[in-house]
Amino acid sequence: YKRQDQSGIVIKQLFVIEPNRTDEALKDYAEETFEINMKVAESLSGTITPQGFFAVIEKPKYDVTQAKQVLLIDRIQDPGNLGTLIRTSDAAGIDLIVMEKGTADPYQDKVLRASQGSVFHIPVITADLKTFIADFNGPVYGTALENAQPYKEIASQDIFALLLGNEGEGCL
């Protein structure tokens, strides 16, 4: 919840198993707090041992016009892969992640767990990649075998986009 405060996420509803054992600061961030039982928590979490609290958040709105270092994701299917890409992008200082329609939902539970909260630190949007690339003011690098060049041989850029393709089909 400390990250929530820094990221500006608005918690609309908070669901907790034991409200009396939940930190008051966390409850203060939520517009509404509800008590749920363990059976409901297990159903919501999809895991054997739920964490004890769940939140409904307002989907963030981002100003993406100033993004200089962008990860473009072309239909990544596996939620664990997407979460890992989000977490790695956050650690690497990427400004924006743009996903093509057909990419896994960044707010799905498995993606959220794999991203370790990074989905709330970095703007993640869905857009038509061809349109985004046409409007982007910088080089776009892709992952492909044809005419491949080692990344260490490419001059460093302040503004760039990196395109990663689908697990089975690559970049379209």
Where are these regions (language model features)?
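N-terminal positively charged helical leader segments and presequences
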Residues: 2-46, 133, 139
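RNA substrate-binding interface of SAM-dependent RNA methyltransferases
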Residues: 5-10, 56, 64-148
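Short, hydrophobic beta-strand segments that form beta-sheet elements in well-ordered domains
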Residues: 12-18, 33-35, 56-57, 124-125, ...
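Short, polar loop motifs at secondary-structure junctions
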Residues: 17-22, 59-60, 129-130, 145-147, ...
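Short, glycine/polar-rich helix-capping loops at beta-to-alpha or helix-loop-helix junctions
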Residues: 21-24, 105-110, 170-172
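Short loop/helix-cap segments at secondary-structure boundaries that form the rim of catalytic
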Residues: 23-29, 62-66, 134-135, 154, ...
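Ordered, amphipathic secondary-structure segments that act as subunit-interaction surfaces
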Residues: 46-56
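Active-site/ligand-binding-proximal alpha/beta "capping" segment
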Residues: 142-172
